[in-house]
UniProtKB/Swiss-Prot annotation:
This is Iron-sulfur clusters transporter ATM1, mitochondrial. Belongs to the ABC transporter superfamily. ABCB family. Heavy Metal importer (TC 3.A.1.210) subfamily. Keywords: ATP-binding, Membrane, Mitochondrion, Mitochondrion inner membrane, Nucleotide-binding, Transit peptide, Translocase, Transmembrane, Transmembrane helix, Transport. Glutathione binds at R311, T312, T313, F314, R315, N374, S375, G376, Q377, G424. Residues 717-734 have a biased composition (Basic and acidic residues). The lineage of its organism: Eukaryota, Fungi, Dikarya, Basidiomycota, Agaricomycotina. It comes from Cryptococcus neoformans var. neoformans serotype D (strain B-3501A) (Filobasidiella neoformans).
Length: 734
């Protein structure tokens, strides 16, 4: 066997085409393994020790398949590329004085190295707490077992070149007719095969043992982050895009997977193997061999890290184009009807193609910079190998080394080329993973503006009386909604809140439900300040039918049962009948199993509102809010539904609040509160308010009577009759 035929074992060389790499085998046969590399990046190089790990390397980069994570309805003009967030730029709940709260989860500004190092170590420390939990000995046992298998596998891996050396030296003798392979090198060949098999076996066992540890850590962190987001206040969610939040969790969990796989299965093993190789070379062949190896490793690592940091700029550009392309595509698809209605298909395609061009440009830079990285790496490594071969050849000439020793040196160094070949990819992905995890952990560190006080107690309802006492509130400091709002909603009565658009009718519910907290004043339920009771008990006591009905992409049965997850099917059917939607459901092909589509887009607005009414009736809370609950219904369905709702309210004595623009729907309310300019302008019954000719309510009523878009002649006639009755009563009083 010639030295040349065995010295190129497992040498990786960059392929000529992006998306592939070439492996030189002992017989010098070139095999091209094509890997799916995003944008021709080095991600296509597979880590042998990680390939079977369940949480495989995340394929960050430009994957437009991630469109599903962008459920935003608003197009960002300049999507932020992922980059390290600083301490001051990390997403936090803005203070009351802040007028420009941060809405992005990423920042593109550079971070000081010292500060970033502290951040990285704090992230790793948080992650370590999840893979080494205090009260879980089973997980600790698995971690210890995985590390033991790792060390055992690397020790055996270093033994492989020694068996190779012994085989070469054993065969480097005169061959006779009685000579057989088993006589000369049988034991070494068997040991070589056993070492390789056991190395692979230990590696796979390590993957299997550590898999549950990694996946448990990923699940735990993702669950905690998701739970924390659900507990954040309304302001937080309105100021951030849902797609960005879901992608932050997705990237953060993938970052955990990569960090665990790279540190446990790549960084630590590579450092251990380099240390063992340097020690072996120094012990067997002298310090010069060890010095060449150590200098090569340091130079190789330095060059790779510096070049990869330079290439990261292009990756950020590709990610920015990817994010923008995802936003454009999802925005267009969600608004499909609008695109078709205005014949703007070509415009949307052009917008999408613009992002593809930006991505294409960045991808070309990624591919060319990858070629520069691979060339530099190969030059450094080839120079080191040449020097090692020269030292080895001199040793053979001097008689201090055998041919087998030369093979041993060659194999020891070449085994290091496998993990080092992925150093650039590992470093870049490690940096990106730390950034992604930092964003996710920052989400966990955010504090909700509305939360239980330390002394909060459950709400004890007596009748459901609601009182706003000198309440002030503003979404933005320069635009106050309420200045000194005070009113009382009697227990068990039907009360309506009306007023011009923007007067804060829906805000009343948001404050009562503690989506927001008032800046001053008190909101009381049966004399209890809602800030002193638990959020859970408060929100269980209030039901709402919102104007924009939120439905899940599930069947009708689930969407109604969401009001009470423990309700039986029969209770769901009864709620549907009360909401006057049973007949519509029965006419559907799959009845209650019918999917409503994303955000309920597969059913009409009126059907959505009736499902929302059924849902809140199933919840059966003592306090009910109806925010334009019948705005999408026809007159007949609205009349029937309101009759059912009124019968429920009358029979059970519930406190109900109706927010309405169509005043005829609340004319039978026990009390009508009219809001204007942040105050209560008027309040009273329908007849009392109509008896005030210059009043706000009277003006709204008259405007709806004369409005050209107002409903049928029968309704107008009925409203005129009501006005005549009021006028007649006034004459009698005078």
């Amino acid at each position: 066997m010639s030295f040349g035929s065995c010295s190129r074992h497992a040498l990786f060389t960059p392929g000529a085409l992006p998306g592939s790499f070439r492996t030189m085998t002992t017989s010098c046969v070139k095999r091209v393994y094509t890997a799916q590399i995003r944008g021709g990046d080095a991600l296509g190089k597979r880590l042998p020790s990680v390939s079977s790990f369940p949480g495989q390397l995340p394929r960050h980069g430009s994957h437009f398949q991630s469109l599903a994570f962008f459920s935003t309805s608003r197009r960002r003009q300049t999507p932020p590329p992922p980059s390290p967030p600083t301490t001051s730029q990390s997403p936090t709940v803005p203070s009351k004085a802040s007028t420009t709260p941060p809405t992005s989860l990423n920042t593109s500004k550079p971070v000081a190295t010292e500060s970033q190092d502290k951040t990285d170590w704090s992230i790793i420390a948080k992650l370590a707490g999840n893979i080494w939990p205090k009260n879980n000995p089973n997980v600790k046992f698995r971690v210890i077992g995985a590390l033991t298998l790792l060390v055992a596998g690397k020790v055996l891996n270093v033994q492989v070149p020694f068996f190779f050396k012994t085989i070469v030296d054993s065969l480097n003798v005169p061959i006779t007719e009685s000579t057989t392979v088993w006589v000369l090198a049988g034991a070494s060949i068997a040991g070589y095969g056993a070492a390789r098999v056991l190395t692979t076996l230990f590696g796979e066992l390590r993957n299997a043992v550590f898999a549950s540890v990694a996946q448990n850590a990923i699940r735990k962190v993702a669950r905690e982050t998701f739970e924390h987001l659900l507990n954040m206040d309304m302001k937080f969610h309105l100021e951030r895009q849902t797609g960005g939040l879901t992608r932050a969790i997705d990237r953060g969990t993938k970052g955990i997977s990569f960090i665990l796989s790279s540190i446990v299965f790549h960084v630590i093993p590579t450092a251990l193997e380099i240390s063992m190789v340097c020690g072996i070379l120094s012990w067997k062949f002298g310090w010069d061999f060890a010095a060449v190896t150590a200098i090569t490793m340091l130079l190789y690592t330095w060059f790779t890290i510096k070049t990869t940091a330079w290439r990261t700029t292009f990756r950020k550009q590709a990610n920015a184009a990817d994010n923008k392309g995802a936003t454009v595509a999802v925005d267009s698809l969600i608004n499909y009807e609008a695109v078709k209605s205005f014949n703007n298909e070509k415009y949307e395609v052009a917008q999408y193609d613009t992002t593809l061009k930006a991505y294409e440009k960045a991808s070309v830079k990624i591919a060319t910079s990858l070629a520069a990285l691979n060339s530099g790496q190969n030059f450094i490594f080839s120079s080191a190998l040449t020097m090692m071969m020269l030292l080895g050849a001199q040793g053979i000439v001097k008689g201090t080394m055998t041919v087998g020793d030369l093979v041993l040196v060659n194999q020891l160094v070449f085994q290091l080329s496998l993990p080092l070949n992925f150093l650039g990819t590992v470093y870049r992905e490690l940096r990106q993973s730390l950034i992604d995890m930092d964003v996710m952990f920052n989400l966990q560190s955010l504090d909700s503006a509305t939360k239980d006080s330390p002394t909060a107690k459950p709400l004890h309802l007596k009748g459901g009386e609601i009182e706003f006492r000198n309440v002030a509130f503003a979404y933005h400091p320069e635009r106050p909604i309420f200045r000194d709002l005070s009113f009382k909603i009697p227990a068990g009565q039907k009360v309506a809140i009306v007023g011009p658009s923007g007067c804060g009718k829906s805000t009343v519910f948001r404050l009562l439900f503690r989506f927001y907290d008032s800046s001053s004043g008190q909101i009381l339920i049966d004399g209890q300040d809602i800030k002193t009771v638990t959020l859970d008990s408060l929100r269980r006591s209030i039901g709402v039918v919102p104007q924009d009905t939120p439905l899940f992409h599930a069947d009708i049965l689930h969407n109604i049962r969401y009001g009470n997850l423990e309700a039986t099917d029969e209770q769901v059917y009864e709620a549907a009948r009360k909401a006057h939607v049973e007949g519509t459901i029965q006419r559907l092909p799959e009845k209650y199993a019918t999917k409503v589509g994303e955000r309920g887009l597969m059913i009409s607005g009126g059907e959505k509102q009736r499902l929302a009414v059924a849902r809140v009736l199933l919840k059966d809370p003592p306090v009910l809010f109806f925010d334009e609950a019948t705005s999408a219904l026809d007159v007949y369905t609205e009349t029937e539904l309101m009759r059912n709702i009124n019968s429920i309210l009358t029979g059970q004595g519930k406190t109900s609040v109706f927010i309405a623009h169509r005043l005829r729907t609340i004319s039978d309310a026990d009390l009508i509160i009219v809001l204007q300019d942040g105050y209560v302008a008027e309040q009273g019954t329908h007849e009392q308010l109509l008896a005030m000719p210059g009043g706000v309510y009277h003006g709204l009523w008259q405007a709806q009577l004369t409005e050209s878009t107002q409903p049928t002649e029968e309704e107008i006639e009925r409203q005129r009759e009501e006005l005549e009755i009021v006028d007649e009563k006034k004459k009698q009083q005078t």
